[in-house]
Each structure stands twice: as C-alpha cells, then as structure tokens.
Amino acid sequence: MVRDGVVLTAPNLGHEGWHRFDLAGSLTARLGKPTRVLNDADMQGLGAIRGRGLEMVITLGTGFGTGLYLDGRLLPHLEIAHLRFRKGETYDERLGNAARKKIGDKGWSRRVQKAIDDMRRLTNFDHLYVGGGNAKRLTFEPNPDITFVDNEAGIDGGAHAWLD
C-alpha cells in the first residue's frame, strides 16, 4: 500500500525495508526531479476509467490488486488482497499467479468470478475494469458493466497521475 508516495506495506516484496519507506522522496532526491508513486492498480485505473460514477479496478497478476474511483477521482488505499476470501485463504493466495498455475485457467476464472461478485456486493460499482498480466487468461465473457483492459492502461494512468 502506498500513501502520499510512502510505501506503508509491501508484503509481496518480501523485505521489511519497504515498510514506511518514502519512495517518492528517495527517488526525487536521487533523480533531482519530482516523482509520484502509486499502487499499480490505482495507476492502471487512472488510465482505464471513464470518470462516471463509482468505478472499480481489479488487477490480476502476481496477486490481486484493487482501485476505487468516484467520478474520476481516486479513492486511495483500498487494499483487499490480504483479506480472507475463501477456505481460509486471502484474495492474493486464491487469485494470484501461483494459484492460477496450480488449478488452471478455467478453475481460476471461476474464482475470479466469485471475487467479482464479492466486489459488486462490497462496493456496488457502476463499472468494473479488469486488468493485469493474467486478465487475458480469463475464460468467461464479462457482463456489460465489466471491461477487460490491457496493461497499456497503466502507462496511460502514469501520465494521468500528473494531471492533478
């Protein structure tokens, strides 16, 4: 989780040195240029959303990322990955790349559909964007209020982060 350029937690990186590390400040000092640091799902969302209503982004890659936006504005710090999902395991454990490899794309896609149902109940989103490196492996057709996005949305989101 990143807040105001500071990495609060990064359990997926496996090193305590990231805990409360001012990444934006460190990069700015070393590069001599202003920097912005965002969660990857937040950044992808900035490049994907339309700015209408409550929009949510989930990213499927090494783990499970989430971002939430209201009328085009990021509502930061939504971190669902480490919450319990099913069978005592977290969203990351059940939906991450290791789980996909273990059970295959079809079984993993069913899990993702259950997670989407959870996110719908939790947020009552108007639109959901699904991205990340493994989104292309999903085996179901999305509902009309769900859009699959490619990783270029993250690059676009990086540019959008500077518009505020």
Give names to the regions the model predicted.
Residues 1-54, 94, 143-164:
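Glycine-rich phosphate-binding loop and adjoining helix at the ATP-binding site
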Residues 3-5, 66, 138:
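Glycine/Thr-rich phosphate-binding loops of Rossmann-like dinucleotide-binding domains
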Residues 21-41, 74-114:
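Glycine-rich phosphate-binding loop plus the immediately following alpha-helix
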Residues 39-41, 60-62, 132-133:
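Fold-independent oxyanion-binding glycine-rich loops
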Residues 48-49, 68-70, 78-79, 140-142, ...:
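Short, well-ordered secondary-structure micro-motifs
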Residues 48-52, 57-60, 120-123:
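Solvent-exposed alpha-helices and their adjacent loops that cap or buttress functional pockets
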Residues 53-77:
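Gly/Thr-rich phosphate-binding beta-strand-loop-beta motif of the actin/hexokinase/Hsp70
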Residues 89-129, 133-164:
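Adenine-nucleotide phosphate-binding core of ATP-dependent small-molecule kinases
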